[in-house]
Amino acid sequence: MTMNIRRVLRTIAISGLWVALFSMTVEAKTKVTSESFGKMPDGAPVEIFTLSDGPYEARVATYGGIVVSLRVPDRNGKPADVVLGFDNVDGYLANFNGPADAFFGALIGRYANRIAHGSFTLDGRKYSLPLNNGENSLHGGPHGFNNVVWKAKPIANGVELSYLSKDGEAGYPGNLSAVVRYTLMKGDLRIEYSAATDKDTVVNLTNHSYFNLAGKGDILDHRLTLHASRFTPVDVGLIPTGELKSVASTPFDFRKATAVGARIHADDEQLHRGRGYDHNWVLDTDSGGGKLGEAAELYDPSSGRVLKVLTDQPGIQFYSGNFLDGSIKGKGGKPYELHSALCLETQHFPDSPNHPDFPTTELKPSQRYHTVTVYSFSVR
């Protein structure tokens, strides 16, 4: 192991020690178990961890760090799985390596969302990335963090996943040591991301869970609130134009709770380009100093389930399941139809490495990447 890689791992280990010391002061109430979830094509085992806290249950796989299922009670106390996915690792392997990769429930890296033409310049050097979304690189390319097996260990109230992305992997510079911690407590699924590098690089991590709070049907009647006065318009390739546009008097104004389907078919150029909503909103919450702010709220009137999204990130991608067309058969062989779920992906803005005016995603060896997102469930 090279000296640089040792230094990166040491940085992550020290940060992990502080988390462990803090966790020792918190009573662990969530039951954490693990079992086999299948095997990779090369025979490598894949585990699935089950986090159980009363009526709440999350299952997380070591392949792709996938949130495989998330069971949440409705207003009558009846639980249902509120995320899309597959019954076993074979389903994810087929989807993630096929032409209709939907990234169901997966950890996304090294760079969430799109990078135009699969290239960016850092410190005067141009880097080229594999293309997997037309002329662009999407969610780290065809061999991103969703398509690797993470090392895992149980921690208080959850599971810790770690992965070393080597220098040059998927075209990105630097040995990047990433650690992601999933914890479940009292209806809060907390995702904590950390990373360190031995060379200047770019990092933007998120989770790509598809939510349907009813556990069935479509999400067009879900009420969505986004705490954002601006969004980033996109070109025909869904790459930000660089403009930060006001949502006022547009179908993108979700500052007050609005049904997802209320304006999704409006005659709007941006909606036409995304075939619905597939855009980044610029959050109004102050993310300075790592403080968590409420980014979004989703409410399903039929079940009473409420999802609040809290984050310290500057943006959130709202994707309304526009490319689901029934061709993908998910859990129990159920076809995932148009708008059968939506994504709320906390993030830095798409294509930030090519937009100097956007919040930076650069990470230096002297820095530590750290961000937290909480998906908080309740009923109304």
Locate each region found by the language model:
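N-terminal amphipathic/basic-hydrophobic helices that include classical n-h-c signal peptides
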Residues: 1-2, 241
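Bacterial N-terminal signal peptides that target proteins for export
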Residues: 2-15
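C-terminal segment of classical bacterial N-terminal signal peptides
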Residues: 19-27
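An exposed, glycine/acidic-rich loop-and-rim segment of catalytic or binding clefts
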Residues: 29-380
